[in-house]
Amino acid sequence: MAACTLHALSVTLFLLLFFAVSPAKAQQPYVNNHQLACEVRVYDNITNGFTCNGPPSCRSYLTFWSQPPYNTADSIAKLLNVSAAEIQSINNLPTATTRIPTRELVVIPANCSCSSSSGGFYQHNATYNLSGNRGDETYFSVANDTYQALSTCQAMMSQNRYGERQLTPGLNLLVPLRCACPTAKQTTAGFKYLLTYLVAMGDSISGIAEMFNSTSAAITEGNELTSDNIFFFTPVLVPLTTEPTKIVISPSPPPPPVVATPPQTPVDPPGSSSSHKWIYIGIGIGAGLLLLLSILALCFYKRRSKKKSLPSSLPEENKLFDSSTKQSIPTTTTTQWSIDLSNSSEAFGLKSAIESLTLYRFNDLQSATSNFSDENRIKGSVYRATINGDDAAVKVIKGDVSSSEINLLKKLNHSNIIRLSGFCIREGTSYLVFEYSENGSISDWLHSSGKKSLTWKQRVEIARDVAEALDYLHNYITPPHIHKNLESTNILLDSNFRAKIANFGVARILDEGDLDLQLTRHVEGTQGYLAPEYVENGVITSKLDVFAFGVAVLELLSGREAVTIHKKKEGEEEVEMLCKVINSVLGGENVREKLKEFMDPSLGNEYPLELAYTMAQLAKSCVATDLNSRPSVTQVLTTLSMIVSSSIDWEPSDDLLRSGSLGN
């Protein structure tokens, strides 16, 4: 009896100490990108979940970005093991099957609890079935892609009995979702709930606090942050005093086209007697100028009807035209020249397409490129030019360029897409003037025999830049477009090694009315970058770009070309496709050693093997034979952003902490 009493007292004392000491222990440590290094075990206290330092269970909230196929309350509820009715109610949805727009933030009510099986961490349990429909899934892809970092690969590995190489279709995995209950300190401060928010691109602590009607101080303290630095796609706990409601917010899209801001008219202070007088004077002057310009235009038109040829000499400041061309389009200069255009729709389209572009004289381009000399040749029919002291690239195209290509290039405004600045047509040859890329193409860096090499961080940033450009093409311009010709020679690098995609000659409108699928009999492109469904059946979808992007990523990882021809005995040749090689690298045994052998030798050991493995898995999914198994560009961008974020903090010594499980 005494022994039982003593045991009961011991248990009571332990519980009292646990609940008395834990709240004073501070709040919850921020994961800080450690969730990306699956094999690093030294951060288990952070990556496995939020510590049980409050009540054993509570009402909590998660956030989830709507993304097909999880874009209804019903589908999200099944994925996260929560109530569809509660999701519908809190997010003001008409029905549980109402489609939620892609990238819309969804608030998820969830029951959070602490149990002995969790290892002392708060979590909300979900179950995920490896169906095999999405290719080779891993703990990393399930936690960070499917569940959008609401779990971690470390937590899943610790609570599932299957090894990384044992994951096969049909298995059910426990997915511990990160949640937490308020500590005594937070409760005393008036906070009743904790919400797990996934940091979006461009988010700040103050912005998150404002979004959820919380405070920066509460978020900083609640996540044990020592600075304002938070990383994209990492979970942050947001203390709330009331239950959250629908949040109307979307991730920041690419910057809109830059529009010149009209000059602001100074406003006279109240009581100024001259303000209205000067307005009337200004209106009178404007009307007079408009009348004068109209008269001059009429005279100019009559003069042109009598003499259609251009004057033999032009003012120096207006030497932007090719005097020998038979087509001319008004420019942005002070004098506008008009030459007879044919009545064809293509000519009309070309005229409207380049009205906002600078129109160059052929003689000026000759001078700028040293008469298109070999010394100025960059590659093929592209020449380096110096125009008004600035470098430019002039692309020579035999024949007239299409108005659709010019129209597309003119409206593209993204930092990762090469910018068209000017234009010239002479005797059936078109000259396109682009911004200059000081560091050439990634093909020059990866496949040349020189000593120059790209660092790991440069490579992952290049991959992300290209994904940003494709995401812009597929999702942000109207109508959406497919590049259709992505390859390493068309990925250019500026002076800061930021990537810009070029060569839009075969770009095609993505017709959403045809369910993102088109057919063609004219298959064109470079071997090694063409998706099998395009080569075999002429199928065109946005996944065509995803496939080519995957090949480019494999080039960045390995330094190899998309296609390698091996000479064999008796004159035979063996063609090796990089998109096929990766399957043998990541399959079977000794993955770690095979991956090391696959990596570009010029990198040496200066890269994080775990992140290289994750990037290789991403590339492998992009080049999947089945187009439905390939991720969308948006999904690709999400994973790459996490890899880039983690690579920023990586140091070579970090790999000493990693285990050898990749070779298992």
UniProtKB/Swiss-Prot annotation:
GO cellular component, one term: plasma membrane
Domain LysM: residue ranges: 195-238
Residue ranges occupied by any Protein kinase domain in the UniProt entry: 351-643
Biased segments, Pro residues type: 251-269
MF-aspect GO terms: ATP binding; chitin binding; protein homodimerization activity; protein kinase activity
Disulfide-linked positions: C52-C114, C58-C181, C112-C179
Compartmental location: Cell membrane
Residue ranges crossing the lipid bilayer per the database entry: 278-298
Intervals, Cytoplasmic compartment: 299-664
UniProt name for this protein: Protein LYK5
Organism: Arabidopsis thaliana (Mouse-ear cress)
Gene of this entry: LYK5
